[in-house]
Amino acid sequence: MGNQVDQSRTDPLPAWNDGRSKDSILSFVAKVTTPGSPDFVPIPERIATFDNDGTLWPEYPVPVQFAFVIDELNRRVPTEPKLAADPMVQAALAGDLAKLLAGQHFEGLMRIAAHTHAGMTTDEFCATVEAWLAMAKHPRFGRPYGEVIYQPMDELLRYLSAHGFKNFIVSGGGADFMRVWVERVYGIPPEQVVGSTGRTKFELRETGPVLVKTLDHLFVDDNEGKPVGIQQFIGRRPIASFGNSDGDHAMLQYTTINNPRPSFGLIVHHSDDQREYAYDAKPKITGKLIEALKEAPQRGWTIVDMKQDWNVIFPFEREILRHLDT
């Protein structure tokens, strides 16, 4: 145990086992941040984009925002007959995920997500999410969701930040949902979140100005929408992108193909059903990984095997080890 502590003081990525994946990260960062290197990239251009669900924290047994939506529906349906009559709400409460996830942009899921916040001000929605996060726990690990993050990816975020990178979340999840907690959980400020967005409207009330959320969708930040969102909301092409599914395929392509700067792509492959979950081509819910995995060797993308490359997956694993060592 003492060796692990000593290593963590000198190794910027101690949760990563030595090997090809870790070496590829260290090598890329060194070459783009070392002054005088032919591959040096100025700090303003060091943009890194990260998917969230399945890349920075688990998307199983259901994505975290979906768990929030289900809990909100269960809370409201008994007193809101109109909401209870919606077929998509009924599908959600019956556990019919296939119906909700049908279509390229998960129209059913987007619809019920909108139902949980339509008519709320942005401040009210933020308070609702905060209250839920304060009591909700991951059903398998029994920990608050903010503690069930991937320790190796958290180390990577901090390593990149220390080397002048600006990290962005680029996720199919709701931007307003993620902005509530990303700074506390990942150290990423809310203005560096690109996600699916709905229409809001301005109102001047007696208490002051507010923004009110509506049922209308503006932008779905998934699949081919991710490069579009990057251009619209970031305005710079990333030099590094990190994902875990075919939903991140276009973002990886946009980052690494014909980029005038050196670039890096990484795919987190879920291969550990003991410590987390194992899935790729035939996931139960989301996270299908076929095309991006097939293209990775051609593009030089790093494929992270969670089982082989990560000696720790979650921060609380280290707490358990410390207790065993005492």
Language-model segments: what does each one mean?
Residues 2-16, 20-26, 30, 45, ...:
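C-terminal cap/substrate-recognition subdomain and adjoining C-terminal extension
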Residues 7-14, 55, 95-98, 109-115, ...:
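Charged, low-complexity surface segments at secondary-structure and domain boundaries
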Residues 35:
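Active-site phosphate-binding and catalytic loops of NTP-dependent enzymes
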Residues 38-42:
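Short loop/turn motifs at secondary-structure junctions and domain boundaries
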Residues 43-61, 252:
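Asp-based phosphoryl-transfer active-site loop
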Residues 61-147, 151:
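A metal-dependent, Asp-based hydrolase signature
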